[in-house]
A protein has these predicted regions:
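Amphipathic alpha-helical scaffolding segments comprising HEAT/armadillo-like alpha-solenoid repeats
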Residues: 1, 23-40, 63-72
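Short, solvent-exposed loop/turn and secondary-structure capping segments
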Residues: 23-27, 66-69, 105-106, 140-143, ...
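A short glycine-rich, aromatic-capped structural motif
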Residues: 82-150, 155-175, 272-273, 320, ...
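Functional-site microenvironments in short loops/helix caps that host divalent-cation chemistry
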Residues: 153-156, 164-308, 312, 317
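Pro/Ala/Gly-rich low-complexity, hydrophilic intrinsically disordered segments
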Residues: 59-85, 89, 325-331, 335
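Positions within the helices of HEAT/ARM-like alpha-solenoid repeats
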Residues: 5-10, 45-50
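Structural signature of alpha-helical solenoid repeat scaffolds
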Residues: 15-19, 58
Length: 336
């Protein structure tokens, strides 16, 4: 795996070592591989192989060093790698979405017909969190919350029973406290007490703002597929899916800690299953809103990157969210 130059291919090789626990290898081999994976986990510029290294090391019981949360030089760092860790400990992964149409629906709807409309005219740079927002992270914003299902005391399960307004309020709270330098003009949403389900409708102007927000359906679908055209991001096998997805086939009626299964090729976890995630669509005629990715209660066939419509004003045991933000490139080529 050391000689592989493609980070996605290197990720696959790393994950293939996971079943071979240290007891099944010689002490020298175990030490050598562990040291290499620790190096990738700490400093790889690619979230693909970094995520695989962290996943395998956790499975081997190796304590991982917490990554730096100093975001004061994020733009400079982004020129060297495709991820950073914000103050809340959330890893953000930078992706570049091809855009095949003009107008806000090109970045909101995530419709397959837009992908077949012709050659791409531009790209949209954005970042999406590698994991769903955990209960611990949401509780930093809200002193208490009526989560459903009794989970572990460390609150590592994804936040659930979340409705869309709570998710947007968290994004606004995070943006207000971020050292990434957001001013009011950068905010996608108004003050927290003014956010309603109406703010799930995004304009082009709002999408150009760089504060934290929910992903659009197009962004979510692109991050989920991770460059594949198969039913699930890992391929077509519903048996192998259980290594990547918390669903009825393995959940036993419970959620999994965020990021505890295998990541997709771009280093993003739990895009299939665990909790369904609120996204920014245009609302349907019924006033319902988009949830993506299936959840812990459904069979594998319902964990694909499909869109489900539910009332945005209600939460369920299977509804949660992850965060995103637009990335801009300055005239000098710097990202911000």
């Amino acid at each position: 795996m050391r000689h592989e130059t493609d980070p996605v291919a290197r990720q696959a090789l790393i994950l293939a070592t996971d079943p071979f626990r240290s007891g099944q290898r010689t002490a020298d081999d175990a030490s050598d591989v562990t040291g290499y994976l620790q190096q990738l986990a700490a400093s790889s510029p690619h979230q693909s192989d970094r995520s695989a290294a962290r996943t395998v090391l956790r499975g081997w019981g190796v304590e991982l060093k917490a990554p730096s949360r100093d975001v004061s030089e994020v733009p400079q760092r982004l020129a060297q790698r495709n991820w950073w860790v914000n103050e809340q400990g959330i890893t953000m992964v930078i992706l570049e979405l091809p855009v095949y149409a003009s107008g806000p629906q090109a970045l909101v709807a995530g419709r397959e017909e837009e992908a077949s409309a012709g050659p791409k005219s531009r790209t949209h740079l954005f970042a999406i969190s590698s994991t769903e927002v955990s209960r611990e992270q949401l509780l930093r914003c809200q002193q208490s919350f009526p989560f459903l299902l009794e989970g572990p005391e460390d609150h590592t399960w994804p936040a659930n029973n979340v409705f869309s307004v709570v998710a947007m309020q968290y994004c606004r709270w995070l943006s207000e406290r971020s050292a990434e330098g957001f001013d009011e003009v950068d905010m996608c949403y108004p003050e927290r007490n003014r956010i309603t389900t109406d703010h799930l409708q995004l304009s082009d102007e709002q999408l150009r703002k760089t504060s934290y927000r929910l992903p659009t359906e197009a962004e979510w679908e692109y991050a989920c597929s991770s460059g594949t055209a198969t039913p699930w991001s890992h391929g077509s096998s519903d048996v192998e899916l259980l290594e990547f997805c918390c669903c009825a086939g393995n959940s036993r009626g419970k959620l999994f800690p965020v990021g505890s299964l295998y990541p997709n090729a771009w280093g993003i976890y739990d895009m299939h299953g665990n909790v369904a995630e609120w996204c920014h669509p245009a609302p349907s005629a019924t006033g319902n809103y988009a949830l993506r990715g299936g959840n812990y209660t459904v069979p594998t066939s319902r964990t694909k990157s499909r869109s489900l419509n539910y009332p945005g004003s209600k939460g369920y045991s299977f509804t949660g969210f992850r965060i995103a933000r637009t990335i801009l490139r300055t005239d000098s080529g710097e990202l911000k």
